Amino acid sequence: MLFCDDSKKYLKEQNINLKNEFDKDDKRVEKFSLKHQNIYFDYSKNLINNYILKSLLESAEKSSLKDKIKQMFNGAKINSTEHRAVLHTALRDLSSTPLIVDGQDIRQEVTKEKQRVKELVEKVVSGRWRGFSGKKITDIVNIGIGGSDLGPKMVVRALQPYHCTDLKVHFVSNVDADSLLQALHVVDPETTLFIIASKSFSTEETLLNSISAREWLLDHYEDEKAVANHFVAISSKLDKVKEFGIDLEHCYKMWDWVGGRYSLWSSIGMSIAFAIGYDNFEKLLAGAYSVDKYFKETEFSKNIPVIMALLASYYSCTYNSQSQALLPYDERLCYFVDYLQQADMESNGKSVNIAGGTVNYQTGVVLWGGVGTNGQHAFHQLLHQGNIFIPVDFIAIATSHHNYDNHQQALLANCFAQSQALMFGQSYDMVYNELLKSGLNETQAKKLAAHKVIPGNRPSTTILLDELSPYSLGALIALYEHKIFVQGVLWDINSYDQWGVELGKKLGKNILKAMNDDSSDEYQNLDDSTRQLIAKVKNK
């Protein structure tokens, strides 16, 4: 693998000291920052210099990244294990140029489906869609899991100031009944519309929650016909949708060339449109499309997703980083980390290359984090004084939607202070002298100083948005989507399958059978540990 082999040979030997780099180059921020419209990307606090950046960019060229980008946007089946194109970008493409996949112009299909979703949203919002008893819909319950939940839920929360339809949107994902009950406790069966989001219409969690929601509805109405007024589906399995009782006119498409974790731009984003209105949903798509064009057309040295991917891959291959912290300093982005965990870790958590060979380098990392300033009082201690190498992405919003300017200034000051503290830290001498000034004697100061040293020289990137709007959020999400794609290219892995989740599903079905029948083959084939766990549950 060229990228990791090249980087490991010499880049760490540069021994970058961030304080020294800033001291000797007053143009460093200008050199190592980029802008796309209203998004400012400052990567000057990373362990790089001109030589390292040049080397990373050369590795990107060697990986045939330009060709891979063209292949993805043109509909080549880059998801090689499932023989599928990867075209979530087509869902937000505003051009009219035909895009042929398997003999069909998918642009026309996408346009038709968008219109269908728009009509449904407008029908429900206007009150023309009514519940079985004739009442107007007031609540939307989205039942889905993974990409059918994390993306829409994140966007609906992030864009709460743009909610404009008077519809309350709820999300149910976990097979734990508590997830469903939390929603059912606050909605009225006569004014609730359920969205079942499942391509196969057989995902265990989604199907079980949907069946229970259907039973809840029919307990109230006692009439099967009510289902058609209170359920719509997003699925490719029309027979199963019809059997459930949903009018096929209200079944919306999911295509094989859209992966679940990249599907919020599709009909899966219906719940978003119900919350913020279809016009704002289109602005979300437009923001992502602006990044798609920028990503395709911009040279690598000025291309934010490429630089993001190069930095992350550089730290993984050169510093053996196994973790990346994502710290959004905005409460509206409280679900952003959860969303990106799936997008990143399910995409790049692979240990074989595209040809099927075992890789001998590190690929995907653990992505984690949380909103500021909460994290400062929870896990930032590890970032500053722990002995684990953890690169950090800070996300900040320059202006807020509220009028509490003093809160916003404090929030931003804390964000910028954290990145500065990671970079500079505080030395033993600095701490020792401060302790003496505070009144401690020399013995006391020496004893305490070592505990207060913060090493610094820890890399971080700051992404600053002018505002958090549908357009800018769409752009931000797309930046990370393309970063994930570029990393997959650099590591020569398939970022668009997820075989690792299938075994657990299969075994889960077997264990469920075993729990209900200890004479079954499934039970007989269990290991002793699992049998004991089942026995403990049954004996309660």
Swiss-Prot record:
Q: Which SUPFAM superfamilies match?
A: SIS domain
In terms of Pfam families, this protein maps to: PGI (PF00342)
Coarsely, its chief localization is cytoplasm
Xref: InterPro entries = G6P_Isomerase, G6P_Isomerase_C, Phosphoglucose_isomerase_CS, SIS_dom_sf, SIS_PGI_1, SIS_PGI_2
Cellular location of this protein?
A: Cytoplasm
Q: Name one GO biological process term.
A: gluconeogenesis
List, alphabetically, the Gene3D superfamilies matched: 1.10.1390.10, Glucose-6-phosphate isomerase like protein, domain 1
Report the leader peptide range.
none
Kindly list the GO molecular function terms attached to this UniProt entry: carbohydrate derivative binding; glucose-6-phosphate isomerase activity; monosaccharide binding
Give the enzyme's EC designation. Answer: 5.3.1.9
GO CC terms:
cytosol
- Pathway, per record: Carbohydrate biosynthesis; gluconeogenesis; Carbohydrate degradation; glycolysis; D-glyceraldehyde 3-phosphate and glycerone phosphate from D-glucose: step 2/4
Q: Which residues form the active site?
A: 346 (proton donor), 377, 505
Which reactions appear under catalytic activity for this entry? alpha-D-glucose 6-phosphate = beta-D-fructose 6-phosphate
Q: Which UniProt keywords apply?
A: Cytoplasm, Gluconeogenesis, Glycolysis, Isomerase
Protein origin, superkingdom: Bacteria
Q: Function of this protein?
A: Catalyzes the reversible isomerization of glucose-6-phosphate to fructose-6-phosphate.
Identify its protein family: Belongs to the GPI family.
Its name, as the record gives it, is Glucose-6-phosphate isomerase
State the species of origin: Francisella tularensis subsp. holarctica (strain LVS)
Q: Which gene encodes it?
A: pgi
